[in-house]
Amino acid sequence: MEDGFSSYSSLYDTSSLLQFCNDDSASAASSMEVSDRIASLEQRVQMQEDDIQLLKSALADVVRRLNITEEQQAVLNRKGPTKARPLGQTLPLRTTVNNGTVLPKKPSASLPAPSGARKEVVVPVTKSINRTSSSERVSPGGRRESSGDSKGSRNRTGSTSSSSSGKKNSESKPKEPAFSPEEGYVKMFLRGRPVTMYMPKDQVDSYSLEAKAELPTKRLKLEWVYGYRGRDCRNNLYLLPTGETVYFIASVVVLYNVEEQLQRHYAGHNDDVKCLAVHPDRITIATGQVAGTSKDGKQLPPHVRIWDSVTLNTLHVIGIGFFDRAVTCIAFSKSNGGGHLCAVDDSNDHVLSVWDWQKEERLADVKCSNEAVFAADFHPTDTNIIVTCGKSHLYFWTLEGNSLNKKQGLFEKQEKPKFVLCVTFSENGDTITGDSSGNILVWGKGTNRISYAVQGAHEGGIFALCMLRDGTLVSGGGKDRRLISWNGNYQKLHKAEIPEQFGPIRTVAEGKGNVILIGTTRNFVLQGTLSGDFTPITQGHTDELWGLAIHASKPQFLTCGHDKHATLWDAVGHRPVWDKIIEDPAQSSGFHPSGSVVAVGTLTGRWFVFDTETKDLVTVHTDGNEQLSVMRYSPDGNFLAIGSHDNCIYIYGVTDNGRKYTRVGKCSGHSSFITHLDWSVNSQFLVSNSGDYEILYWVPSACKQVVSVETTRDIEWATYTCTLGFHVFGVWPEGSDGTDINAVCRAHERKLLCTGDDFGKVHLFSYPCSQFRAPSHIYSGHSSHVTNVDFLCEDSHLISTGGKDTSIMQWRVI
């Protein structure tokens, strides 16, 4: 425990505080102006508050660690010795509550769900976007959710810009599935089109369409999230006193303890998180999200959630029905105990609003700018001053009663930049900005005029500014990728350059001791010092992600995407084994059964084979000029089947353990693009699905279609990734348009079936899933289409990939 407290001492040096507080000369100096003396007292109070909050954080961490110990002991007592990873590593806190459901304010007799468990059913918010008066609703937890509008609400169009697609089901009643006991098939309908699926002979007599499928006894628990959203978000990286680095991707906020290699996850949001702020108490966190659309077409309004980073309890939800499109900037006030929160939305007017977040009341709002707003922050010593910056503007706002009054920053002799990209504050209350011209400008406290300028501090725009605890200013450049530190007189101290592979600096945060944390536009989180190297602690893809392949015998998987990267991941160490840049955007991948090579298909018709140990290129081929959606090796490793968007399946003979390829031919017969492929256990047959819901069977060695039902109905399939088939048709929801489900995978033990859909959900079914409307456990986390899912080699974990959210999520099967 002493080690735990020693880690906190590195965050704050209390000896300097005591020395400062005992020094009466500051207040006794006759030359000091009254305003400076007041500012000095404010600093003293703030430093004392920081120490108090530090002690609170330390105590909270002690409680967290004690609960981890209790949790581990309880598991050991219940299950006995086990080789499995300790429960405490994925359930760090026993008292944590259900990841985002708002808790009732009154005591409840029922116990909340554990924090680590994912929210399995999302209850969409149904409050209207357009409101004309104050309103409130009772949440499922029994807590009243105030609209936060005590003065009437702005009318909103409720436009949505979410990446999650919401498809309304057809108003006409869909046709029910039909069972033919004479022919032994089930017929279902997608968009009114019949899909006929023949069942094995031995199931015809016992099958009933009215039978009810059972929920699986196993469940999923989110264990790890790969990736970080730096490409289009700012100020979203912080170090908490508990030693956790907090950031977000998709709809999940990640709390990552790098030293202990543990992640916790706040999962209260139902769509993309776009902004994050940490309260002065260093425990309370606010996160804002975009608008979304639910599966049934209902709008999910943008809002801000305030939550406890120790327990993961949601404390307050504000702005439902007020914000438009997305919440892009948020910040807590500093000098009044963090009682206020400011937010900027993504409406055409980019409205700035100020909230008493504990009362969930809006104090004031005003049109901020017609142009993009990049940052909004409270002045550190004056609660009533807010600074916003963005395209062609820098504004100083004063909160007076229920109004916000604006003063524009005057550039005067200084050339006005096209973008003011970031803002921070000095110890004496000056405002400091970084702009697209590479200049650092200092604005005197209480004024809107420039008092000092550092011309050409960077080559190109300054994307981030961070004021360290010791008064050192750190600036991060975009174009030049440089990290530069400056003293109190704005003289350059140190300079470091981030390697080109990591991309431009997006945000800078202070870590432990002299460690600096950096988020980049290529979705890396780096840590290092100004005098040393920076190494990645988190990385992910930067463009749409579709390809996923699982190693046959190791806890490894490969992902590839439109960013032209193919990455092999270690699922145990949660880090990349290697990353390979390829020449074309990638779409699909597949491991050879030996695991020695992996094939990657692209959007251009080219496909590559790489050595999994060295990542060296083994061979490259081209088949057509359209997207290759599926790469699937036969179980015996002697064939490779490639499904293309030109409606054909290309078959290659494979020898030399996956290193030599000879084209056998192509299977033609589909009238639409190939979506999924599976091989039979004996490698003699192939089944395929297409974009127009066809199910066709093939003898791949001869590239001939098999039309005999008696031949195909009893084939045993080595894998089940086809979304259409008798054993999986129960995964389709009623009224589906046939494109809702992007991926299906069967566990190796053949008792579980998982799907990824267009609504950001991962579903876990029992296998076989051959009853209509089969029940499932539902898991949220992705904010875009779930493009692929697959179980690791021993079925211990499931991997899911997001499309536009570029995230990879690793779920533990429990």
UniProtKB/Swiss-Prot annotation:
Subcellular localization, as worded in the UniProt entry: Cytoplasm; Cytoplasm, Perinuclear region; Cytoplasm, Cytoskeleton
Q: In which tissues is it expressed?
A: Detected in adult brain cortex, hippocampus and thalamus. Expressed in the stomach, lungs and in Sertoli cells of the testis.
Describe the subunit structure: Homotrimer; self-association is mediated by the N-terminal coiled coil. Does not interact with EML3. Binds unpolymerized tubulins via its WD repeat region. Binds repolymerizing microtubules. Interacts with TASOR.
The record's annotation in PANTHER family points to: ECHINODERM MICROTUBULE-ASSOCIATED PROTEIN-LIKE 1, WD-40 REPEAT PROTEIN
> Where is the region Tandem atypical propeller in EMLs?
175-814
Q: Which GO MF term does the entry hold, naming one?
A: tubulin binding
Q: Where is this region: Disordered?
A: 77-180
In Swiss-Prot or TrEMBL terms, this protein is called Echinoderm microtubule-associated protein-like 1
The residues bearing each WD repeat, given as ranges, are 260-309, 314-357, 362-399, 408-445, 449-488, 492-529, 534-571, 577-612, 616-654, 663-700, 708-767, 774-813
Q: Where is the composition biased (Low complexity)?
A: 103-115, 155-167
Kindly list any coiled-coil regions of this protein: 31-72
Its job: Modulates the assembly and organization of the microtubule cytoskeleton, and probably plays a role in regulating the orientation of the mitotic spindle and the orientation of the plane of cell division. Required for normal proliferation of neuronal progenitor cells in the developing brain and for normal brain development. Does not affect neuron migration per se.
Q: Which pathological condition is tied to this protein?
A: Defects in Eml1 are the cause of the neuronal heterotopia observed in HeCo mice. These mice display heterotopic neurons in the rostro-medial part of the neocortex, together with epilepsy and subtle learning deficits in adults. At 17 dpc both Tbr1(+) and Cux1(+) neurons contribute to the heterotopia. Three days after birth, most Tbr1(+) have reached their final destination, but many Cux1(+) neurons remain in the heterotopia and fail to reach cortical layers II to IV, contrary to the situation in wild-type.
Which InterPro entries does the protein's record reference?
Beta-prop_EML-like_2nd, Beta-prop_EML_1st, HELP, Quinoprotein_ADH-like_sf, WD40/YVTN_repeat-like_dom_sf, WD40_rpt, WD_repeat_EMAP
Q: Where is the composition biased (Polar residues)?
A: 92-101, 127-137
Q: Which family does it belong to?
A: Belongs to the WD repeat EMAP family.
Task: Output the GO biological process annotations, alphabetical, semicolon-separated.
Answer: brain development; hematopoietic progenitor cell differentiation; microtubule cytoskeleton organization; mitotic spindle organization; neuroblast proliferation
Source organism per UniProt: Mus musculus (Mouse)
Q: Name one GO cellular component term.
A: microtubule
What is an example of a Pfam family matching this protein?
HELP
From the UniProt record, report the name of the gene that encodes this protein.
Answer: Eml1
Q: Please quote what the entry notes about the protein's domains.
A: Contains a tandem atypical propeller in EMLs (TAPE) domain. The N-terminal beta-propeller is formed by canonical WD repeats; in contrast, the second beta-propeller contains one blade that is formed by discontinuous parts of the polypeptide chain. The N-terminal coiled coil is required for association with microtubules.
